[in-house]
Amino acid sequence: MTNIRKTHPLLKIVNSSFVDLPAPSSLSSWWNFGSLLGVCLGVQILTGLFLAMHYTSDTATAFNSVTHICRDVNYGWLLRYLHANGASMFFICLYLHVGRGLYYGSYTYSETWNIGILLLFAVMATAFMGYVLPWGQMSFWGATVITNLLSAIPYIGTDLVQWIWGGFSVDKATLTRFFAFHFLLPFIVTALVMVHLLFLHETGSNNPTGIPSDPDMIPFHPYYTIKDILGFLVMLTALAPLVLFSPDLLGDPDNYIPANPSTTPPHIKPEWYFLFAYAILRSIPNKLGGVLALVMSILILAIVPILHVSKQRSMMFRPLSQCLFWFLVAVLFTLTWIGGQPVEHPYIIIGQTASVLYFLIILFLMPMISMVENYLLKW
């Protein structure tokens, strides 16, 4: 008798995706982050669902409802901090996942890569709107500053901002719609994840060497299922101390002050995972230029496949490109640090230098180094 997992209409989809899926035998731990992101998404949806049962999206009660969750709801503090720090873990895994794709040339699967970029934008939008919901000082002013950037768009900018706000300032209407979208977007993200996996399974996984691995494949289960479970345990080991011992480590103290439109915090800044993009935005004196640079800092990933001129897919055997890649990582760390600093000397010039280097490395230096490596291959 044939196994039910291979014949049942629903189970055979799961089987071909997670059980009998042929996978390259050489996948390293860098291939764990896809499954870790799936776990993060699941945790965020579950904790978010329970938080939404107690949260009220009204300017008069939003801040107090979050306090109520932490103080009065059974394990409400755990739900709240799992959700907040789970988002940080989500972005750590996201950035490592994208970095893996850049390093090993996974972007040559252009459909999977482009859906991934769309996913990155969707998750960033979700996180931004979620940060507004506790209705603290940084929530309010962060929402005001970031949405106000759209006013830089010629002709329609001002009308667009007021349309998003639902009035002439960030107020009750803004909070209500942000809550609605924050609730909806994770389900859209889940649908996009399925499309992402669909495109990935059309081509099969890349591997660290970047060489086709068709002759050397192993079944996903049990080899990679057990490896993924180890990944989950490692992530949980990192997340648990953060949530249980220092849950506010990555947050902003200003967000424990209720939103007050008449008092501006000394330094308005987003959550740590947006600081690199925020630094790029601030490094350009022109408002529209800053907004374009902000969008391009992520959208630049879409043109990476076009800029791939190397004869080798992966950076595994390309030491010059490896050096440049890690230099890019250092630039991103610098931008993240600068994004959290006040706008004054010497931070301004450091931010501007790092921003120029970020675009310079991706647009010019990477392709140039690849061409040099191609030339060296002839020797």
Swiss-Prot record:
A ubiquinone binds at residue 201. Heme b b566 binds at residues 97, 196. Its cofactor is heme b. PROSITE patterns: CYTB_CTER, CYTB_NTER. Keywords: Electron transport, Heme, Iron, Membrane, Metal-binding, Mitochondrion, Mitochondrion inner membrane, Respiratory chain, Transmembrane, Transmembrane helix, Transport, Ubiquinone. GO terms for cellular component: mitochondrial inner membrane; respiratory chain complex III. Heme b b562 binds at residues 83, 182. One of its GO terms (molecular function) is ubiquinol-cytochrome-c reductase activity. The chain crosses the membrane at residues 33-53, 77-98, 113-133, 178-198, 226-246, 288-308, 320-340, 347-367. It is found in: Mitochondrion inner membrane. It is a multi-pass membrane protein. The cytochrome bc1 complex contains 11 subunits: 3 respiratory subunits (MT-CYB, CYC1 and UQCRFS1), 2 core proteins (UQCRC1 and UQCRC2) and 6 low-molecular weight proteins (UQCRH/QCR6, UQCRB/QCR7, UQCRQ/QCR8, UQCR10/QCR9, UQCR11/QCR10 and a cleavage product of UQCRFS1). This cytochrome bc1 complex then forms a dimer. Heme 1 (or BL or b562) is low-potential and absorbs at about 562 nm, and heme 2 (or BH or b566) is high-potential and absorbs at about 566 nm. Component of the ubiquinol-cytochrome c reductase complex (complex III or cytochrome b-c1 complex) that is part of the mitochondrial respiratory chain. The b-c1 complex mediates electron transfer from ubiquinol to cytochrome c. Contributes to the generation of a proton gradient across the mitochondrial membrane that is then used for ATP synthesis. Belongs to the cytochrome b family. This is Cytochrome b.
